Structure formats: structure tokens, C-alpha cells
Curated annotation (Swiss-Prot):
Family classification: Belongs to the IF-3 family.
Phylogenetic classification of the source organism: Bacteria, Pseudomonadati, Pseudomonadota, Gammaproteobacteria, Enterobacterales
Annotated compartments: Cytoplasm
Function: IF-3 binds to the 30S ribosomal subunit and shifts the equilibrium between 70S ribosomes and their 50S and 30S subunits in favor of the free subunits, thus enhancing the availability of 30S subunits on which protein synthesis initiation begins.
Official protein name in the record: Translation initiation factor IF-3
Length: 179
């Protein structure tokens, strides 16, 4: 056999014989206070019930220990943390690019996508890009952004509206309205 270092798995709580205190404040299975007892007595009570003695708060004086099924406790804890992760909605910023010369059909498709993103609860970044001579007609670009703003007034709140051109583009950010 090949010898090597074993990776030590550390639990978040000490259980059974890992507890180092002499006396512990013992809590029963249902959360009822049993009182301050010797560690040996607490271990015997847990063993009688076929459960584990788990050190809940090691920094207390004396440390608080509870009689419980440690495997079930870990399972419930991981299950509840997974539930909480599921409930959290990560807000993404979706980007749609327009040009000052975007045709009506393309405009409608992009508008439909904007509506879908906002209904899903995502923020939307609308980038209006200028190329070549389009830079001379910035008013047309602002008109396009105003049209988008007016079409989405019921669904979105304007977080930022461009006052001037940045480089060769204008950027407007929309956030969904709270329901």
C-alpha cells in the first residue's frame, strides 16, 4: 500500500467523543432544556436514544450540546440552503443593439425581445451604435431611444438615459417595474 497524507475532514460541529468539555448544558431532542450534566451522562443519554450528541455552541460556558440525529440535521441544513439558493433570482443585464437606421421589422423584433427580458425580471442595456456619417445625425439616434422609452413606459423604469454620445455609441439602461 502506498502511504501518504490523509485529508482530514472537519465537521462544522463536534459530535459524540469529539466533544472536549467536562460538563455541558444539555438540550433534548425536542429542544427542551435538560440542564448542566457531565459529558459522560450526556453521551449515555444520547446512546440510549440511538442518537448523537452534537456540540451546538462551543464558546458558551458550559458548551451547549443537543441530542439529535446528526446525519438528518446535516441533510435538513443542506436542503434548506439549496431552497434558499433556488429562491434567489440573479438579475442579469441583457444587451440589445440598435442603429439609427434600424428598420421597422427589426425594431419590432428587438422590442419583442426587450419586453421578454423585462418580463423575466432582467435589466436591459440598449446600445445605439453610430458608424461613419451617422455621427452627424445624432438627433436620429436620440429619437430612436425616445421611441424605445415610450414603447416600454408601462414595463420599465429608465435607470440612465444618455445626455451625450460616448465614443461612437449612446447607452440607455432600463430596469423592470416592480409588480
Amino acid at each position: 500500500m502506498k502511504g501518504g497524507k490523509r485529508i482530514q475532514f472537519t465537521r462544522p460541529n463536534r459530535i459524540n467523543n469529539e466533544i472536549r468539555a467536562i460538563k455541558v448544558r444539555l438540550t433534548g431532542v425536542e429542544g427542551d432544556q435538560i440542564g448542566i450534566v457531565n459529558l459522560r451522562e450526556a453521551l449515555e443519554k444520547a446512546e440510549e436514544l440511538g442518537l448523537d450528541l452534537v456540540e451546538i455552541s462551543p464558546n458558551a460556558e458550559p458548551p451547549v450540546c443537543r441530542i439529535m440525529d446528526y446525519g438528518k440535521f446535516l441533510y435538513e441544513k443542506s436542503k434548506s440552503s439549496k431552497e434558499q439558493k433556488k429562491k434567489q433570482k440573479v438579475i442579469q443585464v441583457k444587451e440589445i443593439k440598435f442603429r439609427p437606421s434600424t428598420d421597422e421589422g427589426d425594431y419590432q423584433v428587438k422590442l419583442r425581445n426587450l419586453i421578454r427580458f423585462l418580463e423575466d425580471g432582467d435589466k436591459v442595456k440598449i446600445t445605439l451604435r453610430f458608424r461613419g456619417r451617422e455621427m452627424a445625425h445624432q438627433k436620429i439616434g436620440i429619437d430612436v431611444l425616445n421611441r424605445v422609452k415610450n414603447d416600454l413606459i408601462e414595463l420599465a423604469i429608465i435607470e440612465s438615459f444618455p445626455s451625450k454620445i460616448e465614443g461612437r455609441q449612446m447607452i440607455m439602461v432600463l430596469a423592470p417595474k416592480k409588480k
